[in-house]
């Protein structure tokens, strides 16, 4: 019997096979770090008198607590300022490369690494952050870990893990016009639920996936965690190789040829068997938007807020009742009748260059609706910001009435100055719509950059086709 992509990468990094139910020991190729989950890990090393085993396989950036305006001024939030200064000290003390605020390579941790060519097929990648799964778009095994595990990886460059189950999600056929990667992953989560991938590595397959760009593939793998999975992966191909070629940390010359030769072996065998398999017809999809307070509570944009009574499962019914009340909606309300206050385009899910190009192409020649209080456009990395400005995208956003910001996590989460207030409603290209995610009492609808941009023009949730 053949093996899956995930099983191949796992086997290539196996240091020691666990016995009698014990976990396997895996070698870790790359660890990414940021200011929130690293302080205790560094302190653990310091107290034990240890040094990182392979400091050249660690890299850090500042993203979660960073302001996206006035970055040259002192951070007004004492806790955020402390976390950032602590990361800077720790990286200096232990010799870890840091891309700080204002650095040309700084960005959201899961956006700056791919742009630099650090993320490569067949790697094992970890970070103290749940959306590490983003890097699986390259055919890497990328896993979010806890702070104690961060310390363990720094000290040993290994990680103890029990093998994950495997799951195939097949997106067959061609996507209808206007349907994007964000719509695909929201549709998947709506279908299988936020626990549908629990304990599994999801491999995204099918013709629709093969035709996606790398930016789009990263969007899908990014939200594997919202489906409950430990990781998400897409087999590398010519699209992957073309994206990586010439990037700062990509192999060159003969090493490039050898790397591509290996990368081409990273695909699931025809006779491999997955533990679970789901198939979705791409032609049945349309833009998706969430109505509730978890990413699985999503519907087609042409749909309505569901009636809780329509859920057979008591837990789901109760969750729907609570979500509808929190979101200030009513069952049967058309999604396209929901007016929003704020539009956020950014995050490690949808703050890449392709996302910004899509948003700009829709906003060009328009101005934000009168009821829209603010539109924040936040590139996911400084390199993306620079390229967007070279293409003149920033001018389009500013003419539209949007705020063009510096790179950072921004309004994806309420840990920096870009917060919402109670009962403020946003349409957001980020990955989570939990209660209070974007600020205490905030109400979040997840959507694609295309839907977010169109909504900013009309003032109510809509797709570009509705304009």
UniProtKB/Swiss-Prot annotation:
GO terms for biological process: L-leucine biosynthetic process. Its cofactor is [4Fe-4S] cluster. It comes from the Bacteria. Belongs to the aconitase/IPM isomerase family. LeuC type 1 subfamily. [4Fe-4S] cluster binds at residues 348, 409, 412. Binds 1 [4Fe-4S] cluster per subunit. The lineage of its organism: Bacteria, Bacillati, Actinomycetota, Actinomycetes, Bifidobacteriales. Its EC number is 4.2.1.33. Heterodimer of LeuC and LeuD. This is 3-isopropylmalate dehydratase large subunit.
């Amino acid at each position: 019997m053949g093996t899956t992509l995930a099983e191949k990468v796992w086997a290539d990094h196996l240091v020691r096979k666990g016995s009698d139910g014990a976990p396997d020991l895996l070698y870790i190729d790359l660890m990414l770090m940021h200011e929130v989950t690293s302080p205790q890990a560094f302190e653990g090393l310091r107290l034990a008198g240890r040094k990182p085993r392979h400091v050249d396989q660690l890299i850090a950036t500042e993203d979660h607590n960073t302001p996206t305006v006035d970055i040259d001024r002192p951070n007004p939030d004492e806790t955020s300022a402390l976390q950032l200064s602590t990361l800077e000290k720790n990286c200096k003390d232990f010799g870890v490369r840091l891309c700080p605020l204002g650095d040309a390579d700084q960005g959201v941790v899961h956006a700056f690494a791919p742009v630099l060519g650090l993320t490569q097929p067949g790697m094992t990648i970890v970070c103290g952050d749940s959306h590490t799964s983003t890097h699986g778009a390259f055919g890497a095994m990328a896993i979010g870990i806890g702070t104690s595990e961060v310390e363990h990886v720094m000290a040993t460059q290994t990680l103890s893990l029990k093998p994950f189950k495997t799951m195939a999600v097949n997106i067959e056929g061609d996507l209808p016009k206007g349907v994007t990667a964000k719509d695909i992953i929201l549709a998947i989560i709506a279908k299988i639920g936020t626990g549908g991938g629990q304990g599994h590595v999801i491999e995204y397959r099918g013709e629709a996936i093969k035709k996606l760009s790398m930016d789009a593939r990263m969007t899908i793998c990014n939200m594997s965690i919202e489906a409950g999975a430990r990781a998400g992966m897409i087999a590398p191909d010519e699209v992957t190789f073309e994206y990586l070629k010439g990037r700062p940390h990509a192999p060159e010359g003969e090493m490039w040829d050898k790397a591509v030769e290996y990368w081409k072996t990273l695909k699931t065998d025809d006779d491999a068997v997955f533990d679970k398999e789901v198939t979705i017809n791409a032609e049945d999809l349309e833009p998706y938007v969430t109505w509730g307070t978890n990413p699985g509570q999503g519907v087609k944009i042409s749909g309505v807020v569901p009636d809780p009574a329509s859920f057979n499962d008591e837990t789901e019914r109760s969750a729907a009742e609570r979500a509808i009340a929190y979101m200030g909606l009513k069952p049967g309300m058309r999604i396209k009748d929901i007016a929003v206050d704020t539009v956020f385009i950014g995050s490690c899910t949808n703050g890449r260059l392709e996302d910004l190009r899509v948003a700009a192409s829709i906003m060009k020649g328009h101005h934000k609706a009168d009821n829209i209080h603010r539109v924040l456009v936040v590139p996911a990395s400084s390199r993306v910001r620079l390229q967007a400005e070279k293409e003149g995208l920033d001018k389009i956003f500013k003419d539209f009435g949007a705020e063009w910001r510096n790179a950072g996590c921004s309004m994806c989460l309420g840990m920096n100055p870009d917060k919402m207030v109670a009962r403020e409603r946003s349409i957001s290209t980020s990955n989570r719509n939990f209660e209070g995610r974007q600020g205490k009492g905030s109400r979040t609808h997840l959507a694609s950059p295309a839907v977010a941009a169109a909504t900013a023009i009309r003032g109510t949730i809509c797709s570009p086709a509705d304009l």
